[in-house]
UniProtKB/Swiss-Prot annotation:
PANTHER family linked to this entry: NINJURIN-2 (PTHR12316:SF24), NINJURIN-RELATED (PTHR12316)
Family membership: Belongs to the ninjurin family.
InterPro entries linked to this entry: Ninjurin
Gene: Ninj2
Name recorded for this polypeptide: Ninjurin-2
Record comment regarding domains: Composed of 4 alpha helices: 2 hydrophobic transmembrane regions (alpha3 and alpha4) and 2 alpha helices (alpha1 and alpha2). Alpha1 and alpha2 feature one hydrophobic side and a hydrophilic side. In contrast to NINJ1, does not disrupt membrane integrity. NINJ2 filaments are curved toward the intracellular space due to cholesterol-binding, preventing circularization and ability to mediate plasma membrane rupture.
Segments on the Extracellular face: 1-62, 129-144
Any one Pfam family match given in the protein's UniProt record, by short name: Ninjurin
């Protein structure tokens, strides 16, 4: 063995149409997947920050102010935790046996938190953080 650590090479042989075989490094794939998920997390984070701004601008007298403030804050907090988990997952080497159990647990935790975040965001959308049309005009603090 090359080192004191046991390493499993997680490579998959993939046949191309010409019959050639190439190796797919699953650790590289997992890292790219984590980076892509992090980018989506950033987009959702920005969206929720804008929703939070909208709720705060409407003020505490809006119908669902406390509910939306709580849901958006919980979603933002979960997204930060998910982002940290994804960075940790991307930094650990899947090829090292001693990391595989930990990576599996971290991946399960991240997946669970993403599911909870999606459910929270469904409720945020249902309660609505944006007023439109004549309702917004009537409740605006800057009359026309």
């Amino acid at each position: 063995m090359e080192s004191d650590r046991e390493i499993i090479h997680l490579q998959h042989r993939h046949s191309t149409p010409g019959g050639n075989q190439r190796h797919i490094n699953l650790n590289h794939y997992a890292t790219k997947k984590s980076v892509a998920e992090s980018m989506l997390d950033v987009a959702l984070f920005m969206s929720n920050a804008m929703r939070l701004k909208s709720v705060l601008e409407q003020g505490p007298f809006s119908q669902y102010y406390t509910t939306l403030l709580t849901l958006i804050s919980a979603s933002l907090l979960l997204q930060v935790v998910i982002g940290i988990l994804l960075v940790v997952i991307a930094r650990l080497n899947l090829n090292e046996v001693e990391n595989q159990w930990r990576l599996n647990q971290l991946n399960n935790a991240a997946t669970t938190l993403v599911f909870i975040t999606v459910v929270i965001n469904i409720f945020i959308t249902a309660f609505g953080a944006h007023k439109t049309g004549s309702v917004a005009a009537r409740t605006s603090s800057n009359p026309i």
